[in-house]
Amino acid sequence: MTSPPHTLEAETGPDPVASIIVMHGLGADGSDFAPFVAEIDLRPIGPVRWLFPNAPQQPVTINGGYVMPAWFDIRHDRGDEDEAGLRRSQAAIEALLAHEKARGMPAHRIVLGGFSQGCAMALLTGLRHTERLAGIVGMSGYLPLAGTLAAERSAANADVPIFLAHGTQDEMVALPRATASRDALQALGYGVDWHAYPMGHSVCMEEVGDLRGWLLNVLAP
């Protein structure tokens, strides 16, 4: 049985009413998005549990085989996706979702999100999850294994709210790849809240503000 990844946690108060999972990008770790706890004020909905899972250490082909935190391998040919690695991490995130539900947080109060590789994992896992989630957040990433989604997607999350954000000058995941992912999701009937910002492969405060508003909406009691 797959174990959940080692995960950093922060609760903004006792008895949290929602859980927000944020997965980091290539070469980072769970602490990368810990500032969200202070930057995104969700007090209007009540206490929240933030979870920041750590990707496993593995060689990354496009970086010369250097071992670093990665949810999956990235090869030189963008079309050659590491399906085995993606599926392994999908299973680990499913285990994390199961752990959250086992300690009393219903799926409809869980937001699954991530940045770059973490965005890919949020879309891969969330759209196939068998129980309705509160929402999916994708920052500066793309839709992986897009060709399998129509057959594998979960009816429970057919109408899940999706927040997608991207930098117009992103040098790591080019904007057209992100807009193609958005268009593919919309073609399958998903409702996508799309945001583009004048930045590179990063997060800006305007984006954080927009994300806060979106979270307050999808997690409203």
What are these regions (language model features)?
Residues L164-H166, D170:
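Short beta-strand/loop motif that positions the catalytic acidic residue
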Residues P53-N54, G113, V137-S140, A165, ...:
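Alpha/beta-hydrolase-fold catalytic nucleophile elbow
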Residues P106-N157:
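Primarily recognizes the serine-hydrolase "nucleophile elbow" in alpha/beta-hydrolase
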Residues P176-P221:
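C-terminal catalytic histidine-bearing segment of alpha/beta-hydrolase fold enzymes
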Residues L42-I45, R153-D159:
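Short, conserved loop/helix-junction motifs that constitute active-site signature segments
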Residues V17, N157-I162, L188-G191:
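Short, proline-enriched alpha-helix->beta-strand connector loops that line the catalytic pocket
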Residues F33-A38, A150, A174-A184:
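Short alpha-helix in the alpha/beta-hydrolase fold that links the catalytic acid
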Residues M1-V111:
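Serine-hydrolase catalytic machinery in alpha/beta-hydrolase-like enzymes
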